[in-house]
């Protein structure tokens, strides 16, 4: 059955190699490629990369170093770990050296470095710079070996011990705070939040919709998760002003609240292409020749730390598959639901998808087919059910009284009550 289904439906797989989009053609006017990211000819640079990093470089920034030093804490949190460790070590070593020099100068001015002098020293057992440096370390780290200690002979030495103790506490608080803030950053949480490689455009509830899929690879939830999307493209205003990247919001249900999602299993985000959509006048051919980028954003609070994280990705116009839907990944088992992430990036082709724009579709310039075809989601569900039954030792039926359409594709006789068949327009 699986081999027959492959011939019947066009599958875009991230696990298969090859690029056949430019060479293969099908009845409804577009090809079928098989690659990790299904694209046509590359036509523009990304503003937001697939991994979420912004493809932007800042040049000719005045007083950049001073501005970064003015916000030193944020700078320490944002820099790489290797530089953070360098700052961590330098902060302590330089403070020890500074106060070691101070105690050595106190001993030098008081004459404690003269071994023949019998008067009471400001700091006992400090008769060299090495001894002063060790005393500085013992004071700031409160080691206290007992050989070197400050006396009441020099008030300035007593003051410096107190001052170094305060400075040491400040350094500890700053460095430890920066390290903890860097460790608690939710940036790495984005590694377990994934977007589909391609976006798709297909009919849903009688309307053309732009869709993409998001998934959470962890069992821990993303609290208050919500999605946003923007279309980026260049344009020229009526006054002749050129805007290199005009940002246009794409409605994903903000007004109705459906932009807030419960991200336990992969969810398909839907943008209805209506009269307020920037894609309203674009047909399949227009999408093929368009030059724009759709930035998708997923935001939410990490359940473990309650810190807000933001995961980003983008789709160029050549990464939008017209007339495709995503393969189902959620299957119902006896006592639980199963998510198959091997199907996460895969799509299948819907042959009767209109190629016109949403405007032409709304103005009845394109007549939708009323033919009822067997829905691919139902076939995948039946296949999953058949595999589970075969594992449990349930024999397949040998009845030949099957409908002609299902008989051609070797459909197994599976009870349909738990999984009622749905028409393609009902998905």
From Swiss-Prot:
Q: Disordered: where is this region?
A: 384-427
Task: Please summarize the record's notes on activators and inhibitors of this protein.
Answer: Activated by phosphatidylinositol 4,5 biphosphate (PtdIns(4,5)P2).
Where are the residues marked Role in the control of polyamine-mediated channel gating and in the blocking by intracellular magnesium as a site? Answer: 172
**Tree of life domain:** Eukaryota
Q: Which residues lie on this side of the membrane: Extracellular?
A: 107-128, 148-156
A single GO molecular-function term is: phosphatidylinositol-4,5-bisphosphate binding
Look up keyword NAD and say if it applies.
no
Q: What InterPro entries does the record point to?
A: Ig_E-set, IRK_C, K_chnl_inward-rec_Kir, K_chnl_inward-rec_Kir2.1, K_chnl_inward-rec_Kir_cyto, K_chnl_inward-rec_Kir_N, Kir_TM
Keywords in alphabetical order, please.
Cell membrane, Ion channel, Ion transport, Membrane, Potassium, Potassium transport, S-nitrosylation, Transmembrane, Transmembrane helix, Transport, Voltage-gated channel
Its primary localisation, in coarse terms, equals: membrane
Chain spans, region Polyphosphoinositide (PIP2)-binding: 181-208
Give the bilayer topology: Multi-pass membrane protein
PTM section of the record: S-nitrosylation increases the open probability and inward rectifying currents.
Q: Which residues lie within the membrane without crossing it?
A: 129-140, 141-147
Q: One Pfam family, please name it.
A: IRK_C
Q: Motif PDZ-binding located where? A: 425-427
Q: Does the keyword Transmembrane apply?
A: yes
Where is the chain membrane-spanning? Answer: 82-106, 157-178
**Residue intervals on the Cytoplasmic side:** 1-81, 179-427
SUPFAM superfamilies registered for this protein in UniProt: E set domains, Voltage-gated potassium channels
Q: Where does it live in the cell?
A: Cell membrane; Cell membrane, Sarcolemma, T-tubule
Q: Which reaction does it catalyse?
A: K(+)(in) = K(+)(out)
Q: Where is this motif: Selectivity filter?
A: 142-147
Q: What is this protein called?
A: Inward rectifier potassium channel 2
């Amino acid at each position: 059955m699986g081999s027959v289904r492959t011939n019947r439906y066009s599958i875009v797989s991230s696990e298969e190699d090859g690029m056949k989009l430019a060479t293969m053609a099908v009845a409804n006017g577009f090809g079928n490629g098989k690659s990790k990211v299904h694209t046509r000819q590359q036509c523009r640079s990304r503003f937001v990369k697939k991994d979420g990093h912004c493809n932007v470089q800042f040049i000719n920034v005045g007083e950049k170093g001073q501005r970064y030093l003015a916000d030193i804490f944020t700078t320490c949190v944002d820099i790489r770990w290797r530089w953070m460790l360098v700052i961590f070590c330098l902060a302590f070593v330089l403070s020890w050296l500074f106060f070691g020099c101070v105690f050595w100068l106190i001993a030098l001015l008081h004459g404690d470095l003269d071994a023949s002098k019998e008067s009471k020293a400001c700091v006992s057992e400090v008769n060299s710079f090495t001894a002063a440096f060790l005393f500085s370390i013992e004071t700031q780290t409160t080691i206290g070996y007992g050989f070197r200690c400050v006396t009441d002979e020099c008030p300035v030495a007593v003051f410096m011990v107190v001052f170094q103790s305060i400075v040491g506490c400040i350094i500890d608080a700053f460095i430890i705070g920066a390290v903890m803030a860097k460790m608690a950053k939710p940036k790495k949480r984005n590694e377990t939040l994934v977007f589909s490689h391609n976006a798709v455009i297909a009919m849903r509830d009688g309307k053309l919709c732009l869709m993409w899929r998001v998934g959470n690879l962890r069992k821990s939830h993303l609290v208050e998760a919500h999605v946003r999307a923007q279309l980026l493209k260049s344009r020229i205003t009526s006054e002749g002003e050129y805007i290199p990247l005009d940002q246009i919001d794409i409605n994903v249900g903000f007004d109705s609240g459906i932009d807030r999602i419960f991200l336990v299993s992969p969810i398909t985000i839907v943008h209805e292409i209506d009269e307020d959509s920037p894609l309203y006048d674009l047909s399949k051919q227009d999408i093929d020749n368009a030059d724009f980028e759709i930035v998708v954003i997923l935001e939410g609070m990490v359940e473990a730390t309650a810190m807000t994280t933001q995961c980003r990705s983008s789709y160029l116009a050549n990464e939008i598959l017209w007339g495709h839907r995503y393969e189902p990944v959620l299957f119902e088992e006896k006592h639980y639901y199963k998510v198959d992430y091997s199907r996460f990036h895969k799509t299948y082709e819907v042959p009767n998808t209109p190629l016109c724009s949403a405007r032409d579709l709304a103005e009845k310039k394109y007549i939708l087919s009323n033919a009822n075809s067997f829905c691919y989601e139902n076939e995948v569900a039946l296949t999953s059910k058949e595999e589970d039954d075969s594992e449990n030792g349930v024999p397949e039926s040998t009845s030949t009284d099957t409908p002609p359409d299902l008989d051609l594709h070797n459909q197994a006789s599976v009870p349909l009550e738990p999984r009622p068949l749905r028409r393609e327009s009902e998905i």
